[in-house]
């Protein structure tokens, strides 16, 4: 008898082997037939979706439509390999495996049964790899969105119905983009008003229950696009907005760097009136703005490549010069590869100001764009105004000093007269400036702010200072008590708290030490050093003087030895004191004491041009710097040159008040406050203090603490001497002061210099590098009494006139001729004598005529309150008499007033 396999008849819980095989074959056959049916319904070679467009026209957008189109995604996808870049709208790598519990779209792709997958994991490993979708950059997502926009335009043009974007997501191998009708009530957002509890329509549209849906399925595996359109009810359509002809030109010329900013600016223009009844004005503006931005500043999807294209375009015009990173040393190459900088300088701007810049400022910030991490800018001091001359962006926060050295060296090659660089306490910047062999001035604001915030000092500060060699030499001074700095006298957890009053006094003392200079101690009764001392000796003596002042106030007065050690470790050791204080730069008088020029530039850039946003692309930031900022910088340079160079220092300040730099405005306020204080004091006491401090008005030097702290180096003693010398001058006092430069004094008075300055240039020069400090201090002793009397006479003439070197104004001369013409008529003269306002004008005219005979260079145009024409009353009266002359010629006489 034949042997029978009984196991084939045993019924297992999951069925027999033959039944499982038969079921699997049936499923495969069913799946194959389903795929054949789907492939048979494909619309081939219809990239413009003419089939869908034809259906929309015939059905008028009412009904249901479902069709599959073929599309090749091979150019946008890679399979089995991870992508370098990924889309921002999706996860970095989209892996969809067959065993994942997800909702599978059975209408769009073939799928395997879950039970079959769980039992046959080993057989379908190769098939799993086909379900992996990886995106190459953002090309696939952008292409799908572009196709969706084309389809929405087809619906709008063919039916008039407006479909808007809705839900977006992905399933197995499929990207799904859904939309709905703008007027469908089912998709409106709940925004209830105060008294109306219903769906709020933000665009004032007519809403209907049209049951609309429009979805586009992009199947990457099958290379198909499935379109599902449903719009069951017919209703009124919205009016289509007409694009104004001037909209594109407006967006191009106004350079709004976001679509929202562009639309907000558009609201304040007449162009917006054509959008008032349109709900899709924002969409239209956004679309046109995107086209313009891609042609002007977003030249490439990669912002860095786009920025390089913009820089090359401006480099060809000569406005900027890119700094090369090739042909560098080995150490510099390593530093540049780490930072990966992109740097440029404003070449055309530098060529205009290079002969007038002796001091620059460097600073950095971290929040200008999302592509780079740190941004450096170099700002030049041009007659008290900040002019940006260089810009650098790096991909790392820890920038090496070699990279900063490479950047600063390129800037200094174009600015040969720079002697000092202002910076903060960044070690990389300080080290780079020292390698350039330039003077370094540390920002006063950063130093004082750090000291104000430090309110605790411990025993650790004292032990650290004891290992300092300079501190050991400090203990040898006779005014220092060694026992105070004995660590055994204090506990391990000993701390010193600094009160508000104490920190205020310490900060004031540190401010005086930072703003001090050896020139301010060269005259007066209380000299710190002798005239025969060398510059190095003077610097050391002043350093010891300020160190003693700090010791007296912190240790002896406030009993804060640990806090004194902290200040010594950070700021008052000789190395730090040299770069912190102007005392350490005896051959240069630094006008700038802070890096606020860079801070102000960054703040204006962020608030005015970037609208406080950090999400700008780097190419947009570069376009703002080169297209918007360069024009503003050139205009600022033009106005500054006109005010400081073409006009003499005698130019009236009030006529150019809006163009005044900040230091001049602050000086006006400071001068007025000092005058009010001077009126309350006795002049005798102030005069004695002037002799004690060695106050010199010619060189504008005073040794008092107020002159050191003052931004304009002005104090009550200098104002008192100026008031004594010119007691009868009551006009605009500050118009007498000349240009602000890096010479000494800080502010030069052209009215206080005689005509003999050309002959005695070596003695009268204010450049410290050309003349010694002793020569500057003894200038007034060498001047004779005759020169002083001549100086007073010429100064009085200058104060009456606006500009003694300028020609007579043609307009004023013509008005004088008209006035003389009316005086020549006897009848008119009688009427003039009866007019009370003209009596005062005649008196002024008589005085002015006498002055013009002795002073032929006098200029008639003036606005001074004590001497000159009253223009308003004069012109008004001339109009009356012109009318009188016309009436007299016609026979109607007299004219009543």
UniProtKB/Swiss-Prot annotation:
Source organism superkingdom: Eukaryota
Query: What does this protein's UniProt record list under function?
Result: Mating type proteins are sequence specific DNA-binding proteins that act as master switches in yeast differentiation by controlling gene expression in a cell type-specific fashion. Required for efficient mating as an alpha-cell.
Give the note.
There are three genetic loci for mating type genes in K.lactis. MAT is the expression locus that determines the mating type of the cell, whereas HML (containing HMLALPHA1, HMLALPHA2 and HMLALPHA3) and HMR (containing HMRA1 and HMRA2) represent silenced repositories of mating type information. Notably, HMLALPHA3 is not silenced in K.lactis. The mating type is determined by the MAT locus, which contains either a copy of HML or of HMR. Diploid cells are usually heterozygous for the MAT locus.
Q: What is this protein called?
A: Mating-type protein ALPHA3
Protein's organism: Kluyveromyces lactis (strain ATCC 8585 / CBS 2359 / DSM 70799 / NBRC 1267 / NRRL Y-1140 / WM37) (Yeast)
